[in-house]
């Protein structure tokens, strides 16, 4: 090489491998030393040598050259181990999905990065002349990332949306990919191909816009005479030396530089490498340099402000088109880099945080008051410190002090023992970097179907008050309680209600019909009554033919009923214990329009019937009236059926048990209609008392009468009662004969003879004596409606006789009750009908036996669901009433869950027992729960949760563990097994004494109560039933394991405790097991036996627990929950949405949009937003400090200078992160163009510019000086597109965008284009004013320079201006130190303006 270059003795011989960067540096040194012509000869020789060597050795690539890194195996294994632990934590609910994702990215990113760093040393040691190594290291072909994929591992890939796929590709291309890895790679490759195409065009367009903005900027003068400069401090530690050198080299000094008394640099001297080295060694004062920002010319630039030309080492020539060079040098790396990066195929890059490690082993100590507990980004517990925290680590011989910067996370606890090099703190990365964070939504989908449960309060998000989007206020768990759902679409409303029980054998097993089952297998006092559903015997729908329809009355039959709730509006508060069976009356009487009627079945809230209780009632439509009136019973003096205090309130039926007295039978009653209007006192009445009116007479201003007849007006307290009686008037003959007929009913044959009309009346009449005045009197005869009452029908032996039953059956009697007392006026509310008679079904039993031990019956509704068809049955059990009922307190809030820890008490509804003084030391609490239909937004399909006893693992006390599925075959022979698992009634225990049951044989272990509950030393043998607690909207269905109809998705785990119940808990964890409590996986409930699945305790027995499987999902505060509490989720439904920040991936492709956003000043971007805000802030503050005229001037000046520096630094950062070096002055020329305009504000009135007009800053300053008055303006940031459309040349604007609009506007305004730029001249075919074409322009302008300009006489303003603007280092330094300290970039500190 030495020989080839030149035969010179003084050249130094270098023997080392050089890459592209080193060659660049070499060439620039050669140009400095030898000049251009000589250097090109040297380079030609170098090229020849290179080609010769390459062809001689035939550098090529073989597959054997790809050497895998030896340490890869154990690194990958280690990462997999960490991922496995992470997966476990996520499964236990300690870490949520976003934290898991972040952590797994960091685990694999760190592994991948480590392998990448190992790569070069590995090649260098094992095979330095490996062709792969040579090519990638020299940068000739491929980069480190690609080689890393060939011999390291591909790592994490992005999907087309730019999201990370959390399955890393562990293989490299040398080993070959597995099928899954190949498919994931294809994602990345496709993203690469698409992005390359899109981004190349983006980069091209960016270049076009950049050139458009600055095409007219040409070097036209040698010196503009400015004294301003920008300070760069060599002693600033924040700026790396490389960037410092790059900033200064080729610039021109704006001021002399002194080193003590000695001047080491003169003004207008260009800075070479020698001068820079002197600056660095001497650490001089800040150096003031000239930049394009400080140039005073408006539409061009001078040589000294631009500095050296990048092509050769001298000052730039006059006439050089530096604007176009600047635009292209910024745009070009974009195109190049898009093409280059993307051959790595969408490999994901993340960032890792900086760590502080312990210097030695020892105990760590710090002040706990200064830290706050928090969670790290990965879900680990940590402490956050807000100020500098001093941490001491005491080892045996030495004490180390470590300072932890503010906003760091401390990962260890106080007094913890740490080992050397253990990570003790994490410095928050990215507080000052440009890596823009973007907010990403991550949806979490549920893995299983089930019921939603929250363990904390949840806010309604304000914009969705009525929807099901909720915001979490604090970190908590969401639980999905497992359970299948069953939708029933045939019945219009779902019938599953509170306190439902379902019999085990009432569902058809293998498509058998249920009719035989329900009669023969029903050995308990379990009564079914149900209306008939005929037909549909195909498809295994049960046939109810043997259960004939009951409840026949004279007029109506129950046929094809539909069953409704008491309220059909599902969202209303439902009546809990009843529903109405609607039916149509068979003979619709003369097609009258009647409201639908139905049988209402009511069960008392505690579910207990005494004798002669009303089981159901039926409001017969024929006893229904729309008008007011009075009832009279058949004969005068008939005893009232009801005692007075037991009158039933008809509307809003409460829990009533009226004591009915059946002393006398009433076979008919009478109803005397009348029209009644109740009016306020103030109303003006248009009729007189005792006058006779016709139909539709106006009574008041707004009311007309519906019937004609006699008017009676009575004044009562604060109101007027207006009655209209219809009927005939009779004037009697003899007074004494009539008197006894006052207000009585007269049968058809006993009509008065001596009235004028002595006709025979065919109907009953009601006679009233009326005296309008003392002398006048007459008899008013009113028509009467008569109602016949049928006798009570006794439906004895209603239900089929049970074979094994020893007692009599229940019987039902029909009784008619008149709802209103004798002679009581009945007031109808307009539009509602009045029911006069209610037909009731009375429940009775054991009438023949004198001493029956059974005092009450327990009733509940039973639902049977087969093939989606739901039937409702009533089940009645007879029993003695000597058991203590556990009743629910009357609590409006509904039953909630009882939690163990205080913090989770969301909705607690305690239940109390009869033994109020009971102290329960550690016994399982037994609670009653409710069942409810779930409210779906879909009104057509109601869904409900079904609990089946399959998947129910039973661990018997005496036998070994049996899986329930194994027992299935033997269940027909041995009834005991089905008993232990058939789920008992909800809530209160039924009477077990007389419980002759095929299902519930008395096989529960008798327990002596004193052993566990101290019930005032009351010793009893108690049958323990399995108690259930469901949360608010649960639904339970007992069913057989063999049934396929019911979804068997309810996982129950039977968990047994040992006999010595108290000593059985883990010693460390004093768990108190309470019903409804949630357990995480592997929590220790009993000694030595951690529970294997997470879930909720729903049954507590003395020797066992049943746990309903549940899956916890952790959600941090700010997450949104998408479902209501208790709603049913299906697999794959959206459960939670997390919003988290992630740094955008570092690609130039992602970088290009960043550069574009900065240059276009787009508001979506945080950079320009902060700049805009900052500009406004400076404008206000400075104006406030300095007053108006100076404030605007200096404010705009300062603002513009500061924002320019900020923009330059931001753009440089993006390119530098990609390893692209662009000289600052190119970016400065562009930034100068987009910040050189100011907006005239409306504050000051000036005659020159209109408010809102955009003018150049220098023009504004000059006009202000010329006019000697202040022009108010403020700085604005224009984007490059806007700046291109706001130039001095309309031809250039028209050739860029919106041609017609620009030309039309220019024509209307009469704009003049001076053809100063390149584009205008190209469009018009003239000579462009650069290079040789510049000479003529220069020649012309010299002639103009000789004409002297007249200066205005007053120079005070100019002098003051100079004082402030040109000798204002102190002032500006003051401003920058006080007002501009919040600038976000590091380089500011060394790149401040003077």
UniProtKB/Swiss-Prot annotation:
Its main location: plastid. It catalyses: RNA(n) + a ribonucleoside 5'-triphosphate = RNA(n+1) + diphosphate. It comes from the Eukaryota. It is found in: Plastid, Chloroplast. InterPro entries: DNA-dir_RpoC2_beta_pp (IPR012756), RNA_pol_beta''_euk (IPR050254), RNA_pol_Rpb1_3_sf (IPR042102), RNA_pol_Rpb1_4 (IPR007083), RNA_pol_Rpb1_5 (IPR007081), Rpb1_funnel_sf (IPR038120). The keyword Cell inner membrane does not apply. Its EC number is 2.7.7.6. GO terms for biological process: DNA-templated transcription. Keywords: Chloroplast, DNA-directed RNA polymerase, Metal-binding, Nucleotidyltransferase, Plastid, Transcription, Transferase, Zinc. Its cofactor is Zn(2+). Transmembrane segments: none annotated. Signal peptide: none annotated. GO terms for molecular function: DNA binding; DNA-directed RNA polymerase activity; zinc ion binding. Binds 1 Zn(2+) ion per subunit. GO terms for cellular component: chloroplast; DNA-directed RNA polymerase complex; mitochondrion. DNA-dependent RNA polymerase catalyzes the transcription of DNA into RNA using the four ribonucleoside triphosphates as substrates. Belongs to the RNA polymerase beta' chain family. RpoC2 subfamily. This is DNA-directed RNA polymerase subunit beta''. It comes from Cucumis sativus.
